[in-house]
Structure formats: structure tokens, C-alpha cells
Amino acid sequence: ETAAKNSQDAAAQSESAAAGSASAAAASATASANSQKAAKTSETNAKTSETAAANSAKASAASQTAAKASEDAAREYASQAAEPYKYVLQPLPDVWIPFNDSLDMITGFSPSYKKIVIGDDEITMPGDKVVKFKRASTATYINKSGVFSVAKIDEPRFEKEGLLIEGQRTNYFVKSNTPAEWTSTSNIDKTNNGVDEFGFSYAKMRTKDNMTGQSSALSLHTCSASRGIDVSGDNKYCTVSCRVKAPDGLRCRLRFEKYDGSVYTFLGDAYLTFGTLIIEKTGGAANRIAATATKDPVTGWIFYEATIEAVEGETLIGSMIQYAPKKGGITEAGDYIYLATPQFENGGCASSFVITTTAPATRSSDMVTIPTENNIYNRPLTCLVEVNRNWGDIPPNVAPRIFDFSGVPPIESITYAFNTTEKYYGQLYMQTYKASTSTYVSSVFAGRTDVRKFIGGFNIYSDGTKRVVSNGEATKTMKTEWTGVKTRTFIRIGGQATSGTRHLFGHLRNLRLWHKELTDAQMGESIK
């Protein structure tokens, strides 16, 4: 019985072991199947990766091809685009003077001296590319930040339009920069005065309470005709100017009078209405008065000027700057005009402000020169320069100069200047000498009379013809006998003599000369 029991137990154990072996075999089969599946997946992934790599290589090749095509297209476009400009781009000038913020030349020859600052020391240094500049007095100007500035003797004045070049002028308003001492009527309160943030000395010229309800004008500064400008000689023009501000509707009146030695006579007025900047002229001499007003959008000051032309029999002319109430109205309590830089001068346009004390004061002429030596020799000769004239309908003198030569025989001379005849005033011409007829021959005039700012130039060609250019518009060519300059002398820029009788009264910048012929496209520069 016991043996039978043991035999049953052994059989049970053997059955259990067989079941475990079957279970293990099933697990092994499952693992084998999973392994085969994983291998298949790995093979699939490998093929996918291989396909992706192939596609990436194809994309890279396509990208390189596209980049090469784009590069070729860009190079071709640049070549085509540049083709016309090979006739526009100018060669390096033989003489190049920027006149932007110094007297330094980029190319050309002019031995002179300039001042440089090293630390706290100012040193005068020699150089062979420095434009010569002289002026026997101080002078004022508006710097490139719009600030009123004073230049020392022989110091050039660079404004936003370039180098300012003016002739001699005298301001007949005394104490012109001392507002508290201006010769105003007693009915004006000028105690509120000072210097604004742009450096202008001003006074707030306020009407006193006793003038409320009145309609008369009131003087703010005066130059009596008995102490005024002598117009009995060659000079027939007088110009009064100032900077003003006031509430809209009020008016500033510029008045002219004459004096014959015993009697003062009213000539004419120019009324400026604040807000609209409309100018109205009245009086018997109204048709002889030209007036303009321009507002500076930054400082707010309105530069107001009026010029009168004297007629036969008039000897002394004076002027007044005045407050006037609204047109058709009366003075209201607290009416005022801000006034700065009053000037009354001999000439057909306003010039830079001249500071005076107890007597009229004169600003000397700006004299700008370079030698002809190593700068101008023979033809061909080409010139371009940026010009800004500060005068309008009335030229400051006969033929204001851009440049000419000093003391040369007529056959060597060149005069590049403005025409001042009534029909062509403000247009450019270039004059040379014709030995065969012993006459000076001017080119056809170029430019518009109403344009003050432009790029001017001229050509003297190898074939003995010449022409003038203004803002890219050229005149027809004409014959010239000019062949060159042999005399060692000076090129006078923007003026002729210290008397100021041929001065520009304006600005020059970027003066260039070439000893070669430029194409029409290269001469086509223009500005507004």
C-alpha cells in the first residue's frame, strides 16, 4: 500500500513537470515569434531610413542647383542693372572741395594753414590741401543745430546748406543784440527779454494797458531816415529784416521813410499777418517793395524781410519794425510780439545778422581762394557744384560769382556766375573771351529763375565748345577760344573783391573740377 502511494506521488510529480515543460516550450515559442517580429520591424525601419537618406540627398542636390541658378540670375541681373551706370558714375575729381564742415580738400592743391586742437592746446598746422579763407571781421551764422553762433575773424561759417559766402554789409539798427535798449515807443513794454534755447537774444514786446482799444501801430525798433542809408549813389536798395513770433491774427509792420535834409516822408509798409504769413503792401512806394516771410519749424521764429528800391531824388532812407493789431481790429490787452535779430542794411537782400553797439557796424566780405597752379591748366575742363542763393527777386549785385580767376589776361579768364538782367536773373552763365573780336562771350543761360537751390556746372570740351548745366539740364554748346590758364594766380570762389560787389550771398558745397570730359549722365546731378 505504501509502495502504491509512493508510485502515485511520483506520477503526479512527473505530470506536473511535464506541464511545466510544456508551458516553458510555449513561452519559448512566443519569445521566438516576438524576436522574429522585432527583426522584421528593424528591417522595415532600416529601409525607411535608407529611403529618407536618399530623399535628403536628392533635396540637397536640388537645393544646390537652385542656389547656383539664383546666384547666376543675381549676377546676370547685377550685370544688366550696372550696365547703364558705368556712364553715370563719375571718375575721381582732380579738385574736390566738400565745403561741408571744414576748408579741407579731398583732392587738389592749396598750401595753407589750419588750426587743430590737441587736448587743451590749439595748434596751427601747415597743409597742401586747405582752402584759403579771409574775413576782416567777426560774423554770425546759424549752425547745423539751428543755434545762433558767432564766428571769429577769418573763421568760416558752415550752415546746413554749406559754406556761407557773403559780401560786405552794414547794419544801421544800433544795439541790435541788446533788446532792452531797442528804440521802441514808450507804449511798449520790453522788460521781458533774454536769450532763447537757440541763442537768439529777444524781447517780448508787449503793448501797455493804455493802448488797449487803440488801432495805431507801435514801433519796436527804429532807424530814422536822417541816420539811415544813403541811396544817392550806385546802391539803390535797402533791406530791413528780423525774426518774430506772435499770436495768430496780429501783424508785424515793416515801414520805410525818406529824409531830404529837412522833411521826413512816409514811403510804404509791408504787413505780415501771423498764422497765415500773408503779406500786404501799402503806401505810395508799395510797388517798389518786395517782402517775404519764412517760418523755421524747429525754432518757431519767422524770418521776415522787406526790400525797397530807391528812385531818383531820394537820398536817405530809414526803416521801422512795428507792432500792428489785427486787420480792421484794435489793440487788445496783453498783445505782444517776440522780436529778435533786427537789421537794416544797404543791399537788395537780407544777409547774416550784424551785431551793433552804439553805432552802425559792418561785416566784412568772405574771401575764399585756391591757386590755379596744379588745379586748372587747359581744356577739357568740367565743373559741378552745389549752390544755394539767399536772394530772390532782387540780386545782391551785378553778376554774383560762383568763381572766376584773379588778374589773368582776358583770353585765360573764366567767369562762372549768375545773370542779373531782369528777364534772366538767377540763371547761370559761363563767360570766356573771344580774342578775334576782343569781346567776352557768355554761354546761353541755364536754370530756372525761381529755383534757389541746385547743382550747377559747366563743360569746356576738347573741341573748343562750352555749355552750362543746372540740375541736370544743359544748354546747347557754343564755340569758345579758351584753351587754358598759364598765369599763376587764384581761383576766387563766391566773390571777387573785399568790397563785396560781386559776392554770392549764399552757400557753396561739394565743388568739383575734372580735367576730362564727363558724359551727359555724369553731369545729370539734381537736388531740390
Model-identified regions with their sequence ranges:
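Extracellular and organelle-lumenal recognition/adhesion modules and their flexible linkers in secreted
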Residues: 73-528
